[in-house]
Amino acid sequence: MRKLFLDAFGEKKLDKPPVWIMRQAGRYLPEYRAVRAKFDNFMDMCRNADACCEVALHPLQRYDLDAAIVFSDILTIPEAMGMDLKFIKGTGPVFSEPIQSQKDLDKLKSIEDSIGSLDYVYNAVKTTSSAINVPLIGFTGSPWTLAAYMIEGSGSKQFNKLRKMMYANPQLMHSLLQRLADITIIYLLEQVKAGASSVMIFDTWGGILPLEHYKNFSLKYKEYIAKNVKQKINIPIVFFTKGGSNFFEEIKDKSCDGVGVDWSVTLKQARHRIGVGKVLQGNFDPAFLYGSKQSIRETVRANIEFIQSDKLNNYIVNLGHGIYPDIDPDSVRVMIDAIREFSA
């Protein structure tokens, strides 16, 4: 197995950085769209281990990447807890009966029953890990981000229902977050048992929170998960909060091994605020891939020059969020080739 990705979490400074892409198995690839067309709905595809493996392999077959990520979705846990999940074209994920009260929370399945409904994810991990020669990244949504969809019922610009519960009924909110955290610990451990070499916790909506509420309603539970996972098995864990650059000082002493960085700050700024000892992952603006070949190469060169100038810390080159579905696959090749060229 190529271990450059895992080596980034070691103490030795690497000669070159590993690279992978958030949502690298996705709609921007025509081969992904061909597989997706075989299934009536997205979750049916997620439940098919062979399909998950096939689409996870697509980017590895096209590009020189140092890691794969299991093909799944962050909302597998809420669905396993008994919530009715549908993916609606033009809207995205929708829960028909969102959490609004303690009564709604009481209707959810137990942790044991919920975990038993997620075997299809572990099967996808096992099938994919046995088919690749690079590390496989497992993942989950953070409790706060999962709760955002479970309470709001769908994505939202303002998440008013979510934030209303946080302020008006914090006890109920914490009850939901704790249950999600307890399930997530087992969920990640099962992914590792099935073949994941590291895990990532995506906190997509943590960035909407004020600092103190981020600490109490989001980071607290991510740290709880990371500590409990590491008590069982010491694997690399990466925290990523979209829009979370204001929280770096709070994250630097937590149990994660790496921190995802979006494009709202430079890697230099992130390193200064997080300090030494954590791997930084990121942080290209996904939209930079709309640019010309020359502009892509120039942007890559600037980031690689900084990475090489830091003699103490390792970096994982990635986008600052998931790749957009209308990106030209050839632009991705330009980016990766430039990363390899300028890292040589």
From Swiss-Prot:
Annotated transmembrane regions: none
Record's catalysed reaction(s): uroporphyrinogen III + 4 H(+) = coproporphyrinogen III + 4 CO2
Annotated SUPFAM superfamilies: UROD/MetE-like
EC number: 4.1.1.37
Enzyme class: lyase
Pfam annotation, one family: URO-D
One GO term of the biological process aspect: protoporphyrinogen IX biosynthetic process
Places the protein is found: Cytoplasm
Residues binding substrate: 23-27, 73, 149, 204, 321
Chief location: cytoplasm
This protein's pathway: Porphyrin-containing compound metabolism; protoporphyrin-IX biosynthesis; coproporphyrinogen-III from 5-aminolevulinate: step 4/4
Sorted UniProt keywords: Cytoplasm, Decarboxylase, Lyase, Porphyrin biosynthesis
Gene3D superfamilies in alphabetical order: 3.20.20.210
One annotated Gene Ontology cellular component of this protein: cytosol
Site positions per UniProt: Transition state stabilizer: 73
GO MF terms, alphabetically ordered: uroporphyrinogen decarboxylase activity
Function: Catalyzes the decarboxylation of four acetate groups of uroporphyrinogen-III to yield coproporphyrinogen-III.
Protein family membership: Belongs to the uroporphyrinogen decarboxylase family.
Protein name in UniProt: Uroporphyrinogen decarboxylase
Organism: Francisella tularensis subsp. mediasiatica (strain FSC147)
